[in-house]
From Swiss-Prot:
Signal peptide: none annotated. Part of the 50S ribosomal subunit. GO terms for molecular function: rRNA binding; structural constituent of ribosome. The gene is rpmE. It holds the Pfam family Ribosomal_L31. This is Large ribosomal subunit protein bL31. It comes from the Bacteria. The keyword Disulfide bond does not apply. The lineage of its organism: Bacteria, Pseudomonadati, Chlorobiota, Chlorobiia, Chlorobiales. Keywords: Ribonucleoprotein, Ribosomal protein, RNA-binding, rRNA-binding.
Length: 72
């Protein structure tokens, strides 16, 4: 194999945006932030959690309404 062509593979901290839990893994990235981890995921906890997607849906509807009004 050729020398010095592969990216650096180091220890990084993965941080959950939902619960704040941190854990270490190895990656070529400097840090990783995830939306949901196994500590707070509904499958592992047995609790149902509603993820706020209303903002995305409303934004899509607004863009779609604007696009359909312009095409008429």
């Amino acid at each position: 194999m050729k020398q010095d062509i592969h990216p650096k593979y180091t220890k990084v901290t993965v941080t959950c945006a939902n619960c704040g839990k941190d854990f270490e893994t190895r990656s070529t990235r400097s840090s990783i932030k995830v939306d949901i981890c196994s500590n707070c995921h509904p499958f592992y906890t047995g609790k149902q959690v509603l993820v706020d997607t209303a903002g995305r849906v409303e934004r899509f509807k607004k863009r779609f309404a604007k696009a359909t009004s312009q095409s008429k």
